[in-house]
């Protein structure tokens, strides 16, 4: 006698609306140029998975995800000492929450990650005869908070405070040019 196994898999994905909003302003106030932009994104998803073995539910899984992003940047600039001075701020906030539950084939997961980045910067550029000079500085504060089942995991929740300089000089005359620059680049670990 042979046992017969009928195995059926079904997945149901619940989709909803993704939301995106953008605001932008570019204008002048006296000698000051103002450039502002902001973005907001929101997304969520829900997926049910069921695997049947001879009409018995053998594997059930439920996956839910919710994420949002807000980002904004403001740059203000004006002439200063025969050059151009600009300063501004930049902010980014992300929030993602993933919940995965099932009936015993692997561990449940409830992961939540939030990240905030605040930055302030200033830049000055000036042309002197055949030279163009530029210098700037940026301060950046980055805070990441990672939670498993509502408990903050300190080892995966770093905070960074960085000062990032930029220096550049270029020369151009009679079709010849030369450039020298220094920039400190920051590479953050990936998170997903």
Locate predicted features:
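Eukaryotic, compositionally biased intrinsically disordered regions
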Residues: 147-155
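Outer-membrane beta-barrel signature, preferentially recognizing the C-terminal barrel domain
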Residues: 10-16, 109-115, 155-159, 163, ...
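Face-selective signature of the C-terminal outer-membrane beta-barrel domain
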Residues: 9-148, 172
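Short, surface-exposed, polar/charged, turn-prone segments marking secondary-structure boundaries
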Residues: 63-64, 162-164
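Periplasmic-side early beta-strands and strand-to-turn transitions of outer-membrane beta-barrels
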Residues: 1-6
